[in-house]
């Protein structure tokens, strides 16, 4: 489904939070949304890959990577795993790599930067915990909606039909 965050903010101004504008769309799908699964990790993609291997229909993986711009948490292999398992998208408060390949994969990927260096794969991190970045706190099972204009957060799904 396509989302227009500007229109959603107009319709649901009193019930959404707006994430500070620091994210860039790197994926093949610029607009995406759904219920979030949260991850908190730092320069380690192991827990991310494990989460993406689970069914993600209607979900968005939201990663608090500490804002690191030294190592990429998401690459084309991770995006392909997300697509294969039905995830709507990935929002990463951290970096990605292989940006030309990411553009070819039909999954949403928003991140703050790109860098060619990959993160470790030790599996260190937490899943389904509250995370805070971009001026908002994200709780597991909240809902996010993203497009090239921005990212918004709602505690409940928005009636956009």
Curated annotation (Swiss-Prot):
GO annotations of cellular component type: cytoplasm
Signal peptide (from-to): none
Keyword flag Cytoplasm: yes
Cellular localization per UniProt: Cytoplasm
Molecular function GO labels: endoribonuclease inhibitor activity; enzyme binding
Major localization listed first in the record, in broad terms: cytoplasm
The keyword Methyltransferase is annotated on this UniProt entry: no
GO terms for biological process, alphabetical: regulation of RNA metabolic process
Swiss-Prot/TrEMBL keywords: Cytoplasm
Self-association state and partner proteins as the record states: Homotrimer. Binds to both RNA-binding sites in the C-terminal region of Rne and to RhlB.
Xref: PANTHER family: 4-HYDROXY-4-METHYL-2-OXOGLUTARATE ALDOLASE 3-RELATED (PTHR33254), REGULATOR OF RIBONUCLEASE ACTIVITY A (PTHR33254:SF29)
NCBIfam families: NOT-MenG, PRK09372.1, RraA_entero
HAMAP family in the cross-refs: RraA
Family of the protein in this entry: Belongs to the RraA family.
Free-text function comment from the UniProt entry: Globally modulates RNA abundance by binding to RNase E (Rne) and regulating its endonucleolytic activity. Can modulate Rne action in a substrate-dependent manner by altering the composition of the degradosome. Modulates RNA-binding and helicase activities of the degradosome.
Protein's name according to its UniProt entry: Regulator of ribonuclease activity A
């Amino acid at each position: 489904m396509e989302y227009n965050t500007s229109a959603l903010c107009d319709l649901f101004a009193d019930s959404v939070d707006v994430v500070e504008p620091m994210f860039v769309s790197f994926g093949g799908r610029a607009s995406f949304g759904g219920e979030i699964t949260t991850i908190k990790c730092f320069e380690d993609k192991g827990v991310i890959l494990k989460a993406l291997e689970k069914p993600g229909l209607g979900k968005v993986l939201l990663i608090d990577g500490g804002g690191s711009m030294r190592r990429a948490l998401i690459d084309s292999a991770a995006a392909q795993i997300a697509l294969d398992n039905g995830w709507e998208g990935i929002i990463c408060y951290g970096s990605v790599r292989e940006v030309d390949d990411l553009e070819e994969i039909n999954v949403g990927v928003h991140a703050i930067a790109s860098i060619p260096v990959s993160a470790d794969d030790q599996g260190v991190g937490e899943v389904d915990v509250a995370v805070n970045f971009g001026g908002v706190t994200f709780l597991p099972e909240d809902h996010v909606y993203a497009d090239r204009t921005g990212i918004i957060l709602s505690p409940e799904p928005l009636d956009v039909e």
